[in-house]
């Protein structure tokens, strides 16, 4: 607990992100990763391998932008740093491990940025409703971006803002995911997407109890490799059930088969 509290206090975090609970969530993930390291290992390696395949898809290798690089457990940073002239690790909060890794690599830069580009407006009530959420724009005009990686964030974008708005007014937010998908399609370089599709609730005997969409009504319109992530093994959240995510990895959306 002392280490968690210290990590929370010393990790740089914009005020809006701290208000929404991003620092607290980052510390929680660090702790859960420590407890569930073995269960998470296949998912993390699968994610890294998808990014490695995306690197091979990029004909030019000037700049890579990684969206959702806050902890880096699922990121083959050494491969990216070796392959590209510059690596931009984009997130609202960057954990101690990824900060140290960036410091060790001269061509790796941390970029503190809200990838939805709407959190401030949502929290301050400047958006009438989810349908008025602005489309993200950052990095779109940069011709040197040869690879974009959306790293296990598509299902997470509405989570903390949605919780905040539900606490404030009973509202719900899910449009961030759809806006993020549209944003990715506007890049001219290779775009790699890794993200949760479904959340499965399993009984203690392993039987499936319920399957829930992880995307809050949005969809990922591309086919790719899928696998299961044992995000909360039996006993992690409750002694009577486990939680497992179905994840998709798409090295290049332009080369992937589109799905309805």
Predicted regions span which residues?
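Conserved beta-strand signature within the Rossmann-like core of class I S-adenosyl-L-methionine
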Residues: 147-150, 176-183, 188-196
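A short SAM/SAH-binding and catalytic strip from SAM-dependent methyltransferases
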Residues: 130-166
């Amino acid at each position: 607990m002392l280490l968690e509290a210290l990590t929370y206090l010393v990790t740089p975090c914009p005020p809006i992100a701290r208000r929404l609970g991003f620092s607290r969530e980052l510390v929680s993930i660090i702790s859960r990763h420590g407890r569930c390291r073995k269960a998470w290992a296949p998912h993390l390696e699968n994610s890294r391998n998808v990014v490695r395949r995306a690197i091979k898809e990029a004909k030019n290798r000037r700049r890579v932008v990684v969206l959702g690089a806050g902890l880096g457990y699922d990121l083959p940073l050494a491969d990216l740093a070796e392959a590209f002239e510059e690596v931009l690790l984009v997130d609202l909060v960057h954990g101690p491990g990824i900060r140290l890794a960036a410091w060790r690599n001269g061509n790796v830069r941390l970029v503190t940025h809200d990838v939805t580009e709407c959190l401030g407006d949502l929290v301050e009530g400047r958006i009438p409703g989810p349908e008025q959420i602005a489309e993200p724009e950052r990095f779109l005009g940069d011709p040197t971006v040869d690879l974009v990686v959306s790293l296990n964030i598509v299902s997470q974008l509405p989570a903390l803002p949605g919780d905040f708005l539900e606490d404030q007014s009973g509202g719900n937010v899910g449009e961030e995911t759809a806006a993020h998908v549209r944003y990715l399609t506007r890049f001219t370089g290779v775009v790699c997407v890794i993200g949760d599709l479904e959340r499965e609730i399993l009984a203690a005997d392993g039987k499936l109890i319920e399957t829930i969409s992880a995307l809050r009504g949005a969809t990922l319109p591309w086919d790719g490799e899928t696998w299961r992530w044992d995000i909360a093994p039996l006993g992690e959240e409750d002694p009577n059930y486990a939680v497992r995510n179905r994840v998709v990895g798409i090295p290049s959306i332009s080369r992937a088969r589109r799905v309805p």
